[in-house]
Amino acid sequence: MTTFRPLSSFEKKILTQSLNDQRNGTIFSSTYSKSLSRENDADWHSDEVTLGTNSSKDDSRLTLPLIATTLKRLIKSQPALFATVNEEWEFEPLKQLKTSDIVNVIEFETIKDKEVNCHWGVPPPYLLRHAFNKTRFVPGSNKPLWTLYVIDEALLVFHGHDVLFDIFSAANFHKLFLKELNEISTVTHSEDRILFDVNDINLSELKFPKSIYDSAKLHLPAMTPQIFHKQTQSFFKSIYYNTLKRPFGYLTNQTSLSSSVSATQLKKYNDILNAHTSLCGTTVFGIVNNQRFNYLKSIVNQEHICLRSFICGIAMICLKPLVKDFSGTIVFTIPINLRNHLGLGGSLGLFFKELRVECPLSLIDDELSANEFLTNSNDNEDNDDEFNERLMEYQFNKVTKHVSGFIMAKLRSWEKNGFNDDDIRRMKYDNDDDFHIQNSRTKLIQINDVSDISLSMNGDDKSFKIVSTGFTSSINRPTLMSLSYTYCEEMGLNICIHYPDSYNLESFVECFESFIE
C-alpha cells in the first residue's frame, strides 16, 4: 500500500500522548444557514417554541445528501481528510470512506430541545464529553483522523485528531466546507454511501501536509511590539466594582480527574478503549456581541494591545481573588499560526508554534504591587476604592507588558534561529509529565486564538453562511484551564472557558464575564 510519509518526531510525540490518554483533539462547531436573520434569544424558551417542531425551508437545511455531496468534493482534494496512521506509524491513504465512517447524525424532536442543547451554535456538553472521553484513534485501525457530528441539519461539529489537525486546521475545515457547499448544484445531491475511493483519484497530483518540525530554519519578518498602555480609569472602575469587590472562594488543592499515566510506555491497544480518563471537564461558552466586541477592538487598536496579551491579563486579574500563595507561576501556552508565513493559507495539517509565557503570580500580589505602584506614581490617594482600582490597573498593565514583551522576544529569537530555537526543541522532545512533576507550583492556561481566521464568504441570499461558531480542545493535567475563542461576523466573539471538573472556578467565570462586559 502506498504511504504518504512517516510521522515526524513531533507527530510521534503527539500520537504517544493520545495513546496515553493525555489529549484527544479539537472540537469546532459551526451553524450553517442561508438566512442572516436570527431569532431573538428571548424567543427560544417560549411555549410556541416548546411545542413547535423543526420546520425550516428544505433548501436552507444541511440534509445528509447535501452534506455527502459536499464531503465527496472536499475529501478528494484534501489528503488529510482521507489519511490514517498505520501500525508502522506512517500516514497512508485510506482505500475507501463511507458516510458512516465519518458522519454521525443527531436530531431533536422540537426546536425547544435543539435550542436547549445547542444554544448559540455550540456543541452540547454531553457530546463534548463523549467525543473527548469515549472516542479513541488506534494506529492500524484503518479509520480516518476526524469525524463529523450533524445536529438538527444545521450545526456541524468537527472533531480532529491532534496528530494531523491543529486548532487552526479545525477552523479551516469549516472554511473549506463552506466553500464547497456553496459551489455544488442544488440538484445533484448524492445518496451514495461512498464518500471516497482511492481508485478515483491520482495521488501523485495531491500534496499531503509536510512536517515543518523536522525541516530547515524558518525566517519570519520582524513584528512591531504590541505593548499595553494605560487604560481608562472608568473601564477598570467597572471591573473593580463588578468583580473584585465581590467575595470569592478559593481554588481547591485537588488535581485533575485525569488518571496518572506514564508517558514512557505506551498502553496496549486493547486497554485504550477501556481507559477511565477525563479529557473533557466543565465548559462554559459565552458570546461577546459585535457591538461590544467592536468597542473592545477599538480599545485594542487605540492602545496597541495584543489580543492574546489582553486575554492573559484578564485571566491573571480574575485569578487574583482565588490565589492563596503568590509564590507560584502561571504559564500561558499560546499556539501561533504559521500558515501565512509559510504561504499555506487555509490549509489543514500541523503548522503552528507553541509559546510558553511564564507569569509569576507576584505580578498580581497586592502587597508587592502597592509599594511599586506608590513609588512609581507618587499616588497618595486616600480613597481605598479608588486606590484599589488604580492598583488593579497597574497590575493589569504589568501583566500585559510582561506577556507582550516575552512573546516579542520569542518571535525575534525564532526569526533568528528558525526551528532550532528552544520552543521548537521543547515541542519535539520535552515530556509534559516531567514538566508537571518538576513544576508542581506551576499551572498551565491554554490561550487558543483563532479569531483571525475569517469564516465569512461573500455571497447572495441563496448562499449558505456560517452564523455562529465555537470550539475547545481536550484538557488534562497540569492544565488549569483553556480559553478558546473564535469570531463570526453574524454572532460576534465566542469564548469557551474549559477547566477540569475537580476545580471550583465558577467565581473565575463570573469575574471573567464581568470583565468582558
UniProtKB/Swiss-Prot annotation:
Domain of life where this protein originates: Eukaryota
A UniProt-annotated Pfam family: AATase
An MF annotation (GO) of this entry: N-acetyltransferase activity
Function: Phosphatidic acid-binding protein involved in interorganelle phosphatidylserine (PtdSer) transport. Linkks a PtdSer donor membrane (via binding of SCS2 and phosphatidic acid present in the donor membrane) with an acceptor membrane (via its interaction with PDR17), forming a zone of apposition that facilitates PtdSer transfer.
Subunit record text: Interacts with PDR17/PSTB2 and SCS2.
Name of the protein in question: PSTB2-interacting protein 1
Organism, as annotated: Saccharomyces cerevisiae (strain ATCC 204508 / S288c) (Baker's yeast)
